[in-house]
Curated annotation (Swiss-Prot):
GO terms for molecular function: zinc ion binding. It holds the Pfam family Zn_Ribbon_TF. It comes from Saccharolobus shibatae (strain ATCC 51178 / DSM 5389 / JCM 8931 / NBRC 15437 / B12) (Sulfolobus shibatae). Keywords: Metal-binding, Zinc, Zinc-finger. This is TFIIB-type zinc finger protein.
Length: 170
């Protein structure tokens, strides 16, 4: 087949648009006509069971939903402890303790629950009233002990000395 206008043999069958086009001059030479019977209907259809893949997708979706639910609950608890922490910082003594701990760099990287536990510990550490306070806020003493161990004994004494200096100034 050749182009009637330019005589070129470079003809392109554009099945997407249903046209026969000359690649040299770009003229549409003819339209492509399809038969009434589709090729997909003439062949035997093969049915593949996708239940395995569907089950796997459902399992992944459920896993993601459960993770998001648990994550929301954790965020709500964290928000509660942040609210408690902010309300405690209204008190002048807690504010001073927080400032000293912040200046020492101890509060960086800790969650609000741990910060709250440290504030309670440094406020009531001398008379062991902090254990009762920790129970009220559902803070485990073991977690507080781990944080205090990470801080170290020398640093703890330094912090207590700074807190005593702050209280002597007033």
């Amino acid at each position: 087949m050749e182009c009637p206008v330019c005589g070129s043999n470079e003809i392109v069958w554009d099945n997407k648009n249903g046209e026969v086009v000359c690649s040299n001059c770009g003229i549409i030479i003819d339209n492509i006509y399809y038969s009434g019977q589709n090729e997909s209907e003439s062949t035997d259809t093969i049915i593949i069971s996708n239940t395995f893949y569907k089950d796997e997708i459902l399992i992944k979706e459920l896993r993601i939903k459960n993770f998001l639910k648990k994550n929301r609950i954790k965020n709500k608890k964290t928000d509660q402890y942040e609210i408690i922490l902010r309300s405690m910082l209204v008190d002048a003594q807690y504010k001073k303790i927080y400032k000293v701990l912040y200046d020492e760099g101890i509060l960086s990287g800790l969650k609000a629950k741990s910060k709250l536990g440290l504030l309670i510990y440094f406020r009531f550490a001398l008379n062991d009233r902090y254990l009762h306070q920790l129970k009220e806020f559902n803070i485990k003493n073991e977690n507080l002990r781990k944080i205090l161990k990470r801080i170290g004994r020398k640093r703890l004494t330094l912090i207590f000395d700074k807190l005593n200096e702050e209280s002597d100034r007033i």
